[in-house]
């Protein structure tokens, strides 16, 4: 469970649910207001393998991350499972590869996701694991993996088309994830200020939602209220986490990053506020679940 970083699984589930929902409700052009649909628009027979398959891909990627990083961890993170002797490298390689393979099969065969996006996601995961310690731009691969997960989940079932609105929100999510890493990296270095662009990325979901409300100025009052409510929540999470990390207290950066990661669930709740309001509460509940699991298993 430590290898698989299970504390972040609620964010994977929320990504899958939100991507499926927005793509079901979106149209071929951005000007069109997304449809309002109920939860019965989501097929539970497809959602179960979607969530399980995505979970296995995420855990497989995290497991292989330890396999790729074993030399680095032996020097800098001796408490990790491999250098501490908790598990052998061969077993980690086998376990991670099996999780990736099984997860990809479930997504393609059972959840009926588009093979192109799932294959690209698997490739992206492996590239990130192999390069992130060697290349400072690896953070872009991390965001790219979230975008590819979003794209794959959007094609769950009979849908092969990914609509422009789905891509916009997927890119917003990807930049939010990039913003977490960039800001934390800057704050962790005493002589280096966090890039200002990272702050824009962290507030990206709220800003995109505000732009959408202006764009769809005839959106019904219920959805306008819900978007404003959830948008203020994710903006507050970003603002509070930034202040916490800049406070300089011991463990503040790790705590702030964990809160921002759990905030992915709130970002997804903001997305469905436009199209499937009944899904808001379940996605918001995944946020405290992620925070609770983080107390038992590290999120990073």
Regions found by a protein language model. Name each.
Residues 1, 147, 153-300:
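C-terminal membrane-associated helical module and adjoining short loops/tails
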Residues 12-68, 76, 100-105, 113-128, ...:
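Membrane-embedded alpha-helical segments that form the functional core of polytopic membrane enzymes
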Residues 2-3, 66, 82-92, 109-113, ...:
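Short, amphipathic, aromatic/basic-enriched membrane-interface segments that mark the entry/exit
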Residues 53-87, 91, 180-193, 293, ...:
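Acidic (Asp/Glu-rich) catalytic motifs at the cytosolic membrane interface
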Residues 21, 109-110, 130-131, 155-156, ...:
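Helix-loop junctions at the membrane-solvent interface of multi-pass transporters
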Residues 1-17:
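N-terminal, positively charged, Ser/Thr/Ala/Gly-biased leader segments
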Residues 5, 9, 39-47, 51, ...:
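Hydrophobic, aromatic-rich alpha-helical transmembrane segments
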Residues 48-55, 70-125, 143, 149-151, ...:
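Multi-pass membrane catalytic core of lipid/isoprenoid biosynthesis enzymes
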